[in-house]
From Swiss-Prot:
Belongs to the PA-PLA1 family. This is SEC23-interacting protein. The keyword Endoplasmic reticulum applies. Residues 644-707 form the SAM domain. Residues 207-218 have a biased composition (Pro residues). It comes from the Eukaryota. Residues 1-367 are annotated as: Interaction with SEC23A. Residues 154-167, 235-246 have a biased composition (Low complexity). It is found in: Cytoplasmic vesicle, COPII-coated vesicle membrane; Endoplasmic reticulum.
Length: 1000
């Protein structure tokens, strides 16, 4: 906006005659039109004063030189062409950015209306908008506002009746009220599609003739130009933009639309809902997904019987939004409530990386001022608010905010960042592509994720909740790329991952261990000791008989609680459930799953048996035995042996996985009775190795104790009176008839409840110092797959004295088991060598999510193959040379010693060659190869006969220094696309759904 001249006045006094165009008078046509014109309101304005010389460019005001308005040679601001072209739609922003259809270029910063009208609303005097545009202007003035509508350059008519009094007030009675409310949609507005395309797209998509006034409105001739008010513009004076006017829909022959139609071109802003989230100790405003925002807006605009109690689930049902209180709460875990806003206006400073929404009250004020500016075409508005902020609306695209000025210090400087304004933005149309579409409400599969040591799960010190959020986002992206066809067909929806947090059960006032450890911790290297107490001590806690029970109970109860809560919030869920554990969490899950009870495999001797949380009544046997805890992995043979009524030596050895020694016992004429009388020395003399010898000795000791216990019980029963036996038999008969007499449904155990309680102590065995005896809770479901990420299960089993896992062993209630690890992970260990120690198998290489190996791995294999070929060729040549020497020696000598030496060298060369061939055939297996199927039955039944160990591909930079990336490798699983894709493949494999080729 050009700076006002000292003698400008208000335009009321002028010596020019009415209807005279100062820009296109006879004197004005003599000037060069390469220099833009500025309309002035001086009484003695000479033609020469209409030009803006170069040295006068410094007269441009501060507002004109702001944001996009630089010099007089630049193109005119968007506000000048705002009403200069024919609008092909009702969009007020459709012509922004196009050249104006005026006869002369308007100077930079000059509004489409003259100074008297545009300046009045911005002054601090008593004049306002209604006075500035009142119909009391009875005579055409030299500074009258040029109205360049529809390509016709004219002034507003001088007749008093040309502008109705209700122009800027109420609309004429004949016009139907559109009912627009920028904060509440109506059936007549965009309720069906709240996200309207940007104005530029609307103009391109809906070309056509200009909008005509509705039939019920005032007659169009009310606003037609009076005949002869403007002289015709010569064709030589017309600008290039004007010469193209006849080709456009708005030709000069088209009638000028009513000015009140411009008010109808205002479109209310489309709101979007945001929530405040703390990320790395910073407050960030995150947008809800498009799906969630539409649901929130629909509920917001609807009428609810009890608005204070309206709760809407978002983020796939993991969060609840309390609409009345404007807060967002987590549904499955403890988290600080987050503030929720219905956002329409945003700002961004120099130091901000993203736009920050204004409060809803402040946004309403801005929207009201913006609507006033659009309907009246009055820009460069300076809006001052009581809080001290000043907002200037230069045009629809350039709106800035100035911070309230602070008091300068003794050096005369103010705070940083206050001299530069903030950029203000209306709506989120430009960033709509960056907002996620949202998660589908239907869930195909549920996965519980248990964290490892410490309260943090990655190098950014994030909790398990944030890490699982990242893993969930990665899985959703892979669904759209690798399961696109199934997703489009509706066969696939999504997989839900819920975190299980247990570290808090060790600290706090519940156990008091934090206070005790703090007392004994040395004051030196405080941070390092704090890190050790928070992380590494979890491993020691799990090996403690007291805290191991606490950890196991916490994990079991939390999983059951989350499962019950998920089923209550998703009653239509019919999918499967799996579990995943990272680091120590995988060991906790392995122990829990190893101690689950499967009624299909064993008969529980107690009155109650728990399976999937359902308490079932069982018939009593004649001989009542107290319920015993589930045996650990190294005692799993006892469960098989005890279920056999008649035990033979061969069956016992098979249960102990020692069937290969049956011939040795048979040779010594040892049967089952003789075996129970054998000692360790006897087994040693028979040539039994140490490992099997320990197993047999442990079995003999355990069996002898049980026989002794059974004998004592039999003696006690024999001493009981006949009357007591009859009462016991009657009681047994009554309890056995309960299932047939009771028709009430089976009752559910409370979440985390356990049938029996076992004291925590150590059970000492011959192997090692002893193991922790823990009572494990029964899960309320049977998991389909168990995923172990960076797992130390094999190492813990080894230090417990388990040197081998039986090939026939499997988890009682879980049929799938995948041990996934990074090659540089210092905490991960393999499991397959414990099952098949004699079979040298490399881990299955997990393919890259883009369908190929990493480049450095392919190069490494190529170089390895090339080196092997060169070495093999060299050995072949050497062998040929030695054969030639051998033949030459045979022809010229008969020495047997020389002959033996040559044969010895030839044999060594042959052995080297065979060794190279074997090494060349050893390649890393891939799950896509048929060789994976060749090993069915050879790697045990822990994963249903399939491979167990799966290794990720290392990155090229990680191969340079293994030690540098060791810690990062243990924490890389949360953002690994390869890991997430393997989980999705195996989960949907249970649903007979295979991935397609990656769509990138």
């Amino acid at each position: 906006m050009a700076e006002r001249k000292p003698n400008g006045g208000s335009g009321g006094a002028s010596t020019s005659s009415s209807g005279t165009n100062l820009l296109f008078s006879s004197s004005a046509t003599e000037f060069s039109f390469n220099v833009p014109f500025i309309p002035v309101t001086q009484a003695s304005a000479s033609p020469a004063s209409l030009l803006l010389p170069g040295e006068d460019s410094t007269d441009v005001g501060e507002e004109d030189s702001f944001l996009g308005q630089t010099s007089i040679h630049t193109s005119a601001p968007q506000t000048f062409s705002y009403f200069s072209q024919v609008s092909s739609s009702s969009d007020p922003f459709g012509n922004i950015g196009q050249s104006p259809l005026t006869t002369a270029a308007t100077s930079v910063g000059q509004s489409g209306f003259p100074k008297p009208l545009t300046a009045l609303p911005f002054t601090t005097g008593s004049q306002d908008v209604s006075n500035a545009f009142s119909p009391s202007i009875s005579k055409a003035q030299p500074g009258a506002p040029p109205s360049s509508l529809m390509g016709i350059n004219s002034y507003l008519p001088s007749q008093p009746s040309s502008l109705p009094p209700s122009y800027f007030g109420n609309q004429p009675q004949g016009i139907p009220q559109p009912g627009y409310n920028p904060y509440r949609h109506t059936p007549g507005s965009s309720r069906a599609n709240p996200y309207i395309a940007p104005p530029q797209l609307q103009q391109c998509q809906t070309p056509g003739p200009p909008a005509h006034p509705p039939p019920s409105g005032p007659p169009v001739q009310m606003y037609q130009m009076p005949p002869g008010s403007l002289p015709p513009v010569p064709s030589s004076v017309q600008s290039p933009a004007q010469q193209q006017v006849p080709a456009r829909p708005g030709a000069p022959s088209v009638q000028v639309p009513s000015p009140f139609l411009l008010q109808n071109q205002y479109e209310p802003v489309q709101p979007h809902w945001f929530y405040c989230k703390e990320v790395e100790y910073k407050q960030l405003w995150m947008p809800f997904s498009v799906f969630d925002s539409l649901n929130l807006e629909e509920i917001y605009n609807s009428v609810q019987p009890d608005p204070e109690s309206v709760v809407l689930g978002t983020d796939g049902g993991r969060y609840d939004v309390y609409l009345y209180d404007r807060i967002r709460k987590a549904a499955y875990w403890e988290e600080e409530p987050a503030e929720v806003r219905r956002c329409t206006w945003f700002y961004k400073g120099d130091t901000d990386s993203r736009f920050i929404p204004y409060t809803e009250e402040f946004s309403e004020k801005l929207e009201a001022e913006y609507k006033k500016a659009v309907t009246t075409n009055q820009w460069h508005r300076r809006l001052e608010f009581p809080s001290g902020e000043t907002i200037v609306m230069h045009n629809p695209k350039v709106i800035v905010q100035f911070q309230p000025s602070s008091v300068p210090d003794e050096w005369g400087t103010t705070q940083d960042g206050q001299t530069r304004p903030r950029v203000v933005k209306r709506g989120i149309d430009d960033n709509l592509d960056e907002i996620p579409d949202g998660e589908m409400p239907q869930v195909d599969h549920l996965v519980f994720v248990v964290h490892g040591i410490g309260p943090v799960c990655d190098l950014r010190f994030r909790s398990i909740i944030e890490c699982v959020d990242d893993f969930r986002v990665v899985s959703l992206k892979l669904l759209r790329t690798h399961f696109k066809k199934s997703l489009d067909d509706g066969k696939v929806s999504r997989v839900e991952f819920l975190p299980v947090h247990w570290h808090s059960s060790l600290g706090g006032d519940a156990t008091g261990v934090d206070r005790n450890i703090k007392k004994i911790t040395l004051p030196s290297i405080g941070r390092f000791r704090h890190f050790t107490n928070e992380t590494l001590l979890d491993i020691l806690f799990y090996n403690s008989p007291t805290y191991c029970q606490t950890i196991v109970e916490k994990v079991g109860m939390e999983i059951n609680h989350l499962h019950a809560l998920f089923m209550s919030r998703n009653p239509d869920f019919k999918g499967g459930v799996s579990v995943a554990g990272h680091s120590l969490g995988s060991l906790i899950l392995f122990d829990i799953l190893s101690n689950q009870k499967d009624l299909n495999l064993s008969k529980c001797p107690g009155p109650l048996a728990v399976a999937n949380g359902v308490v079932k009544q069982l018939h009593f046997q004649e001989k009542q035995m107290p319920e015993e805890p589930k045996l650990t992995l190294d005692e799993s043979y006892d469960l098989v042996v005890e279920n056999k009524e008649v035990l033979t030596l061969q069956e016992t050895l098979e249960a102990l996985s020692l069937s290969e020694y049956f011939s040795t016992f048979e040779k010594e004429k040892i049967d089952m009775e003789s075996l129970l009388m054998c000692t360790v020395d006897d087994l040693k003399e028979m040539g039994i190795p140490l490992g099997p010898r320990k197993k047999i000795a442990n079995f003999v000791e355990h069996k002898a104790a049980k026989l002794k216990k059974a004998a004592s019980e039999k003696k006690a029963v024999a001493a009981t009176s006949t009357k007591g036996q009859e009462q016991s038999a009657q009681k047994t008969k009554d309890m056995a008839s309960l299932p047939s007499e009771s028709n009430e449904p089976k009752r559910k155990l409370p979440v985390g409840a356990c049938v029996s309680s076992v004291c925590v102590n150590y059970e000492s065995f011959e192997v090692g110092a002893g193991q922790v005896s823990v009572a494990y809770n029964s899960l309320d479901f049977e998991p389909e797959i168990f995923f172990a990420l960076g797992s130390p299960i094999a190492m813990f089993l080894t230090i417990r004295g388990v040197d081998r896992i039986d090939e026939n062993y499997s988890l009682p209630t879980c049929k799938g088991f995948f041990n996934i690890y990074h090659p540089l992970d210092p905490v991960a260990y393999r499991l397959e060598p414990m099952i098949v120690p004699d079979l040298d198998l490399k881990a299955v290489l997990i393919p890259h999510h883009k369908g190929r190996k990493r480049l450095h791995l392919e190069l490494k294999e190529s170089l390895s193959r090339m080196g092997s070929d060169l070495k093999q060729g060299f050995i072949s040549s050497l062998k040929s040379a030695w054969q030639t020497l051998n033949e030459f020696a045979r022809a010229h000598t008969s020495s047997t010693q020389l002959q033996e030496e040559l044969e010895k060298v030839a044999n060594q060369i042959k052995e080297e060659e065979e060794k190279q061939v074997v090494e060349a055939e050893k390649v890393v297996e891939s799950p896509d190869f048929s060789k994976d199927e060749d090993y069915l039955g050879k790697v045990g039944m822990l994963n249903g006969g399939r491979r167990i160990d799966y290794v990720l591909q290392e990155k090229p930079i990680e191969s340079f220094n293994e030690y540098l990336f060791a810690l990062q490798s243990h924490l890389c699983y949360w953002e690994s696309e390869d890991t997430a894709l393997l989980l999705l493949k195996e989960i949907y494999r249970t649903m007979n759904i295979s991935p397609e080729q990656p769509q990138h």
